Amino acid sequence: HRHLKFSSSFGDKMVINRYNNGTLVFQGNPAYILSQAMYFMALMPDISEEEITQRQKDIYRVSTNSVSQARAELKARIPNAYDKLDDTILKILSPAISLSQSNLNVEEYSCYVFPVLKALEALLLNLLNQKGISVNPPKQNLGSVFVPGQPQHVLSSTNQAKVNDTTYQKCLEDIYDYFKKQRHTRFHANQVLVLTTLIFNKAEADAIISDVLKIIDDTAKKIM
């Protein structure tokens, strides 16, 4: 079986065992690191949304929506984007939406904010890639695409020429503005996001989710 160990700068430790029969077993008492684990699982093609949802129920001891219910809610909240998004992005968003709608009562709510911001990052990378703009960490990060040192982020002249579409360009800049604002407030500025400010208020966490979903849907309506 696969044996994965995670640790964080906050002292959290967690072990995930993935057995040959498909069973996932979590060991440890993590805090924010669970959010990274949920995101990691969403990227794994052999781990289903049903498995992720079940692990959420086990870990947080809450009743969450089924995958079909979460997907229906997601489709209702991003009607313009739902059918246009890469399925991996939907797989990241769906469990986070389900958890946000549960009766979750924890000390800290990064468990579903982290995945939705990673989904927004994934969308931005996809949109850049469609215009032939690549970001290759660790030498490059998203900031390398934009003019440095500006209060509002503007694509570099080279990348503006590649995009050659003012509406598309504005969408890229708006996404990065929001993403960087949240990243600097919530996360470390590296390509792999790490929390530096925890989220202790559920309403604040839910507001971030609503913001991200609105940005995604508005972007889809304009350029996807």
Regions found by a protein language model. Give the residues of each.
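Charged alpha-helical initiation segments
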Residues: 45-111
